[in-house]
C-alpha cells in the first residue's frame, strides 16, 4: 500500500467497489465492483480507501479474474495478515473521472437522498439505496415516519417514462406514477 502524499485525495469521492475476503496466502483480495461492467473498476485510478478516518492511496500491483471473482494484489501487501487489514474497505475514486451521461441516465449516487413523490403529490419517502434486478434498476425508498399505508420501505422500479415521470436533481426530487399502497 502506498503512503505517498500524491496523488491528491479525491475532492468528490465516490465508492466504486469494496475489497472482500482474502484469497490465498500471498496478499490477494477479492474485489466487488459497483461499475456496470465489473472489470471497468480498473479503468478508474487512483484508488483510495479510508482507514481510521484517514485517506490512503492504494496502488494495484495486479488483478485477474478467478472463476466468477475479481481478485487484486495491492502493492506492498504480501501476506494474508496484511490483506486481512483491507477486508471490507470501500474503494473510492474522484467522481470527476466518471463519464458524462446521456439524457435520462443518472448515477445512483446522485439519486440517493432524493424525495420520491407520486404524480398526485403523495410523499413516498427518500431513496436510501438502489438495486440492480437484471431487467431494470429499483429504488429502495424509506417511507416517511407517518406513512398513511404503514409502510417502512418501498421498492419502486426505475423505469423512465413508465414509472419515473420527472427527475429534478437540483430539487432532490423524483416524481413517480406509483400506487402508494403498493
UniProtKB/Swiss-Prot annotation:
Looking at the record, the residues that make up the PRC barrel domain are 103-182
Supply the PANTHER family for this chain: RIBOSOME MATURATION FACTOR RIMM (PTHR33692:SF1)
GO terms of molecular function? ribosome binding
Highest taxon above the source species: Bacteria
- Described function: An accessory protein needed during the final step in the assembly of 30S ribosomal subunit, possibly for assembly of the head region. Essential for efficient processing of 16S rRNA. May be needed both before and after RbfA during the maturation of 16S rRNA. It has affinity for free ribosomal 30S subunits but not for 70S ribosomes.
What's the protein called, per UniProt? Ribosome maturation factor RimM
Q: How does it assemble?
A: Binds ribosomal protein uS19.
The processes (GO biological process) annotated in the record are:
ribosomal small subunit biogenesis; rRNA processing
Family membership: Belongs to the RimM family.
Can you quote a single GO CC term?
ribosome
Keywords recorded for this protein, A-Z: Chaperone, Cytoplasm, Ribosome biogenesis, rRNA processing
Q: What is the lineage of its organism?
A: Bacteria, Pseudomonadati, Pseudomonadota, Gammaproteobacteria, Enterobacterales
The answer to keyword Transcription applying to this record is no
InterPro entries per UniProt: PRC_barrel-like_sf, PRC_RimM, RimM, RimM_N, RimM_N_sf, Transl_B-barrel_sf
Q: What is known of its domains?
A: The PRC barrel domain binds ribosomal protein uS19.
One family name in Pfam for this protein: RimM
Q: Where this protein primarily resides, as one coarse class?
A: cytoplasm
Compartment annotation? Cytoplasm
**SUPFAM superfamilies recorded for this chain?**
PRC-barrel domain, Translation proteins
Amino acid at each position: 500500500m502506498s503512503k505517498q502524499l500524491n496523488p491528491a485525495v479525491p475532492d468528490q469521492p465516490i465508492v466504486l467497489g469494496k475489497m472482500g475476503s482474502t484469497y490465498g496466502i500471498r496478499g490477494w483480495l477479492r474485489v466487488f465492483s459497483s461499475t456496470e461492467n465489473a472489470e471497468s473498476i480498473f479503468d478508474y485510478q487512483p484508488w483510495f480507501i479510508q482507514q481510521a478516518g484517514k485517506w490512503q492511496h492504494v496502488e494495484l500491483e495486479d488483478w485477474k479474474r478467478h472463476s466468477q471473482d475479481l481478485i487484486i494484489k495491492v502493492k506492498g501487501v504480501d501476506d494474508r495478515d496484511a490483506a486481512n487489514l483491507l477486508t471490507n474497505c470501500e474503494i473510492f475514486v474522484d467522481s470527476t473521472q466518471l463519464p458524462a451521461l446521456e439524457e435520462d441516465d443518472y448515477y445512483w449516487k446522485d439519486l440517493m437522498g432524493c424525495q420520491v413523490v407520486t404524480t398526485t403529490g403523495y410523499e413516498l419517502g427518500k431513496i436510501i439505496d438502489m438495486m440492480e434486478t437484471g431487467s431494470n434498476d429499483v429504488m429502495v425508498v424509506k417511507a416517511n415516519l407517518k406513512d398513511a399505508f404503514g409502510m417502512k420501505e418501498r421498492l419502486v422500479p426505475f423505469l423512465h417514462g413508465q414509472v419515473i415521470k420527472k427527475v429534478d436533481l437540483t430539487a432532490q426530487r423524483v416524481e413517480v406514477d406509483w400506487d402508494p399502497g403498493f
